[in-house]
Structure formats: C-alpha cells, structure tokens
C-alpha cells in the first residue's frame, strides 16, 4: 500500500517539524529517502554529509531486541543516499546540537507500532489512505519509478540485494 504524490504531499504538510527529533521527523526522512524503519532509527548526526548532500546508511538499530546498533540487513544495504536540498536545509537545523555518534531517533525502547500510529493519525488528518512506515518506503520507490528512474537505480537507493525485490 502506498500514497500517490498528492497524497504524500498532503500528509507531509501535516507534520510538525518544530522542536527536536520526533516521529514526525523520522516519517519525513523515510518518505524522502525510502529507508527501512531500522535504518532510520540507526541514523546518527555523523551519517549526514551536508556538503555532498548524502546520507550514509551503514548500520541499523535493533529495536526488536531492546536497542543497540547492528549491521544492515545485507551487504547491498550499506549505501549512500542522495538528499534533496530542501531536506538538507531542514536537517541541518535539527542535527546541529546533537551528539555526532548517538542515534537521532532511538531513545529508550522503540516500537514501530508507535511510529505507525503517528503516521496513521497524519494520514487521517488530511484524508488520505492510512499506510505504515514501511508503506512510505513503497511510496518512495513507486514515485521514483513513476518519474522514470530506472529499476536498477531505485534498487540501489533502497539497498535491495536484487532488482527482483524492487520489482515486486
């Protein structure tokens, strides 16, 4: 299940990006990058390269087993993801005073059900279909493919080991 471009834009407009790291910020990052939930949780300020407008995906957060950094899902999951300038501007303010090696979003016990219910509320607020955080990953991929980006490029961006996964 995924949103179209108009639905996504409406939902993103409902996010509250004032203040420090929050579920709304994580939702924005997943929507704009297609990261897996565990990859987004594993992000630290030092993973963001503002000069090159990239995000380095090199670890995940083990939210299912009480937390801590663990390796990515597979070797292909280690990657650099290009960020758009608007997201770079937004994130530079968010990250500037945070400790460089600490997770931005993983504080204490983390449940994906919490992130999913926050996202569901935003979807309902603007009258778009309710999707999960993983659905945002599908949304990101679908919009790229619809815009004419090759399956190979989308596959690399998502960290898939095989293009077959992307096509499914």
Give the ranges of each region predicted by the language model.
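Active-site/catalytic core of tyrosine-dependent DNA strand-transfer enzymes
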Residues: 2-8, 60, 84-129
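Short, contiguous acidic/charged loop-to-helix segments that flank catalytic cores in large enzymes
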Residues: 15-18, 68-78, 104-110, 127-135
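Conserved tyrosine-mediated DNA breakage-rejoining catalytic core shared by Y-recombinases
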Residues: 5, 42-93
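Short functional hotspots where side chains directly engage DNA or cofactors
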Residues: 52-57, 106, 132, 143, ...
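Exposed loop/turn and edge beta-strand positions of beta-sandwich/beta-sheet ligand-binding modules
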Residues: 23, 51, 77, 99, ...
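Short basic/aromatic active-site micro-motif
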Residues: 22-24, 108-112, 129-148
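C-terminal catalytic core of tyrosine-transesterase DNA break-rejoin enzymes
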Residues: 2, 28, 32-39, 121, ...
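Basic, Lys/Arg- and aromatic-enriched nucleic-acid-binding interface segment
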Residues: 1-43, 51, 97, 137
